[in-house]
């Protein structure tokens, strides 16, 4: 009885080819693609092209009746000098910006709203950004002549009223931490991207947060902050800076495909030359 082992051997051969190709992709081509694109990204966009400034590094003035104001001075850094990054340590720090450069501001606001009444959970949060210290908390309409409002918007938020409470079912469902329940039910998240422009010639920037209804208290989450991004003339660089993670996925995929094509062409060329060499050696023999 003859046993045909050609099929299992052929299957084993092709399986080994697939495993080798997968290992080359995983251990050589993919890391090489990541390194090449990372170097390409840093050449186009230096590490100091953006800076995340937490709101807890601003000077803060609170007023339940009149809102909360965050203001900080700007320090212009000349070209050729390293641009420092803001340290998230809760201490007031000047905002470093490259001299003669326009910036775009991305706001990431996370906050709780407490109501002193037992009704009206829904409210509007008024957001104003000023060039300068901005208005006094007691007189929102009376700003300094040097101040310039460069952005305004209103966003709906949910406020925690006096009669609101957490049920045992909610606590059991979301975990033993009551703060997790508050995060799930009452944490308001507002993101505003690519709508605010700021020049490094400004001396001060201030962000003014106020609810339409007076009897509210805002509690700012420590993750809140403002991302300062350099505004380049090339739209592609701005997009890469805004969507860094997405640009890495696309860029690495492109370089991965290019390297795979080069590997394939090189492998086919080497295979053809080897076959020709074998054929010539057979003819001579």
From Swiss-Prot:
Induction: By calcium shortage.
Membrane topology: Multi-pass membrane protein
An example molecular function term from Gene Ontology annotations: identical protein binding
Keywords: Endoplasmic reticulum, Lipid metabolism, Membrane, Transmembrane, Transmembrane helix
Null allele phenotype: Produces supersized LDs that are up to 50 times the volume of those in wild-type cells.
Residue intervals passing through the bilayer: 17-37, 245-265
Superkingdom classification of source: Eukaryota
Gene Ontology cellular-component annotations: cortical endoplasmic reticulum; endoplasmic reticulum; endoplasmic reticulum membrane; lipid droplet
Stretches assigned to the Lumenal side: 38-244
GO biological process: acylglycerol homeostasis; lipid droplet formation; lipid droplet organization; lipid metabolic process; negative regulation of sphingolipid biosynthetic process; phospholipid homeostasis; positive regulation of lipid biosynthetic process; protein localization
Localization per record: Endoplasmic reticulum membrane
Segments on the Cytoplasmic side according to the record's topology features: 1-16, 266-285
The keyword Transmembrane appears for this protein: yes
Function in brief: Involved in lipid metabolism and lipid droplet (LD) morphology, number, and size. Facilitates initiation of LD formation, and ensures that vectorial budding of LDs from the ER is directed towards the cytoplasm.
Note: Present with 846 molecules/cell in log phase SD medium.
Family statement: Belongs to the seipin family.
Name of the protein: Seipin
Species whose genome carries this gene: Saccharomyces cerevisiae (strain ATCC 204508 / S288c)
């Amino acid at each position: 009885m003859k046993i045909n082992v050609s099929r299992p051997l052929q299957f084993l051969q092709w399986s080994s080819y697939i495993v080798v190709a997968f290992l080359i992709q995983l251990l050589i081509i993919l890391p090489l693609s990541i390194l090449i694109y990372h170097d390409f990204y840093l050449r186009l966009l230096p590490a100091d092209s953006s800076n995340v400034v937490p709101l807890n590094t601003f000077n803060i003035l609170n007023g339940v009746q009149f809102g909360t104001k965050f203001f900080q001075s700007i320090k212009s850094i000349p070209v050729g000098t390293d641009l420092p990054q803001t340290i998230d340590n809760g201490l007031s720090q000047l905002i470093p910006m490259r001299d003669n450069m326009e910036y775009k501001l991305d706001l990431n606001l996370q906050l709780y709203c407490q109501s002193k009444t037992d009704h009206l959970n829904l409210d509007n949060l008024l957001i104003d950004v000023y060039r300068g210290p901005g208005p006094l908390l007691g007189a929102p309409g009376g700003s300094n002549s040097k101040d310039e409002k460069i952005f305004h918007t209103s966003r709906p938020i949910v406020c925690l009223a006096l009669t609101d409470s957490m049920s045992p079912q909610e606590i059991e469902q979301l975990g033993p931490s009551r703060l997790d329940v508050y995060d799930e039910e009452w944490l308001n998240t507002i993101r505003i991207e690519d709508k605010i422009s700021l020049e490094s010639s400004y001396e001060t920037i201030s962000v003014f947060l106020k609810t339409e209804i007076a009897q509210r208290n805002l509690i700012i989450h420590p993750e809140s902050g403002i991302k300062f991004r350099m505004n380049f003339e090339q739209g592609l660089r701005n997009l890469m800076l805004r969507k860094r993670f997405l640009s890495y996925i696309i860029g690495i995929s492109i370089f991965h495909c290019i390297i795979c094509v080069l590997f394939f062409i090189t492998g086919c060329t080497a295979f053809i030359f080897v076959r020709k060499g074998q054929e010539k050696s057979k003819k001579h023999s």
